[in-house]
Amino acid sequence: MVVADVPAAFSDMRASRSARPRTNEVTEAAHQRTAGAATASGTPEAVGARTAAATADEGLSFTQEAVGMESPSPRMPSVGVVIPTRGNRPEELRAAVWAVLDQHYDGRISVVIVVDGASPEIVAEQVADVIVPRDAKDALHDVRVLPNRLSPGLPGARNTGIAACDTDLIAFCDDDDEWLPGKLAAQTAALAGGAEFASCAIEVEYGTHRRPRLAGTETITKADLVRSRMVMVHSSTFIFRRGTLWVDESAPAGQNEDWDLALRAAKRRPIAYVDRPLVRVRWGGSHYVARWADRIAGLEWMLARHPELAVDPRGAARIYGQLAFHNAALGRRREAGRWALRTFAARFGEPRAPIALAVATGLIPASKVLALLHHRGHGI
């Protein structure tokens, strides 16, 4: 395999790892699929069993061999980290993989990069340089690059990755985000109390600005996620017990699949939460950022899927205000006004309604509103 050159931004990484012999062996595994493709019908968990059988470990494998090295401690749960990518952000992807492999964690880490709509071979070349074991801790860490075998888009890519894992835990990381030091250790400790699902605070990066987003709690409940989207409960913070949850691939354009997953998790059992920033989330660069119409469809999908969202006045007003804003951004003034009225009826003090009306009347562009909010680490 031809290994892509590492840009200057990663020269320090390469230098720190090149002191040891390169032991990566890149192999192509051609496994036979053991079942038919998973269908899109049924609940995510019902589809999950079929999905796991339908997505064999095909793809490119980077195994970190280490003769004579001790295996990671069996007392620590193994973690499968699913990183979806479209393959056209190599520097950010390398940084994401590096940050995962650089965790000080005594258990096995298995990274599954799922390529959605691009060449797995090219993506494998992009990450080859950052996968060099440094010590015994890295001995059994592995990285695989697989094609998305399910529905195109983010939910299908995530489920492809989940199905490819045999680990105790599943974790997500977007290809433009980075785990910060101590994430895995802190979250696995939080899960040790009996929780099935854990999250943590984030550090939002927008341009040159970074702002922490904390929740001020150690537990996230269903009521919390009904009342507020809780932006800090971000997909790149998710870690949960394998076999408990799958992503719903019916989400329109993948919109709100992460909120839906967290809400379903919280309905099962409260979410363990570490209230310090352990993931750096970059806003404004995601390939999966949706268009306004997709955002509208995603919110309407959530209201239909989780009727309780319309019961809590604060939570309902927030969603209605978002729908008013998104319609205003599309120039649908009548629809924006209708949703603004519903917002005021649910909770008169909800700020999104007047903002949406300002956009609908042309007082301020929607893009400028988002830029101002993102600059402060907030979204609409």
Task: Give residue ranges: language-model regions.
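Catalytic core of nucleotide-sugar-dependent glycosyltransferases
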Residues: P277, V281-G284, V289-G315, R333-A345
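Short, acidic, metal-binding catalytic loop of nucleotide-sugar glycosyltransferases
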Residues: W98-R108
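A conserved acidic beta->alpha catalytic loop
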Residues: V115-D129, L150, D174
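Short aromatic/hydrophobic "clamp" motif used to bind/position activated sugar donors
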Residues: I170
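Conserved nucleotide-sugar donor-binding catalytic segment
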Residues: T217-R295
